[in-house]
A protein has these predicted regions:
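Long, positively charged, glycine-interspersed low-complexity recognition regions
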Residues: 163-169
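Internal alpha-helical scaffold of NAD(P)-dependent oxidoreductase catalytic cores
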Residues: 20-108
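Alpha-helix N-cap/loop-to-helix initiation residues
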Residues: 11, 36-37, 128
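Short, flexible, solvent-exposed loop/turn segments with mixed acidic/basic and small polar residues
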Residues: 17-22, 119
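Rossmann-like NAD(P)(H) cofactor-binding subdomain of soluble oxidoreductases
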Residues: 1-16
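Interdomain hinge/lid region at the active-site interface
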Residues: 92-160
Length: 169
């Protein structure tokens, strides 16, 4: 056994959701390789590199913290936004006719299976709660600025958030 987590996927699951080249140049995380047979680790590394994937080694704690930030909170945010809009949709049937690519990309993850995600949230609960608290804090900052009509600071926060462009292309 070699503990590994390919860091690529879509909102769909099962064989019918297969996408050619999904894993190309994405990372897979290997954890606790020192507890695995060295030959098995070498085989797994060769397999992932042949896809071709990049390999990162993390301890399980770091893996769980990082995935809470870059994956799990994105899913919760998408689920929450979808529920927010679906509750409004009950009163205004035409709302989805107005939705375009920005909305679609933001709620794409809400199509993910609860069969997959509830166990992930259960297993990584403490880290997800920490990240969710920080996310709620950020949302509260934006809310407070809107209430105060402090659009200069609102602008600055958006500019600060835009710096993610330099990290993620």
């Amino acid at each position: 056994f070699v503990s590994s987590h390919p860091m690529a996927g879509t909102e769909y699951s099962g064989p019918e959701a297969a996408i050619p080249n999904l894993f190309d140049q994405k990372y897979t995380v290997l954890c606790e390789t020192e507890r695995s047979d060295p030959d098995a680790v070498e085989l797994v590394e060769r397999m992932f590199r042949s896809i071709p994937m990049k390999i990162a080694r993390l301890d399980p704690t770091s893996h769980d913290v990082h995935t809470a930030y870059i994956s799990h909170i994105s899913h919760i945010s998408s689920f929450a936004l979808a529920l927010t809009v679906l509750s409004k949709e009950k009163d205004e049937g035409r709302i989805f006719e107005l939705a375009s690519s920005g909305f679609s990309s933001t709620v794409r993850l809400a199509k993910s299976s609860p069969d997959m995600w509830v166990p992930i949230f259960r297993q990584n609960r403490d880290n997800v709660l920490d990240v969710l608290d920080e996310h709620i804090n950020q949302l509260s900052r934006f809310r407070s600025l809107l209430i105060k009509k402090d659009f200069d600071t609102f602008y600055q926060l958006i500019q600060e958030a835009n710096s993610i462009r330099k990290i993620i292309s």
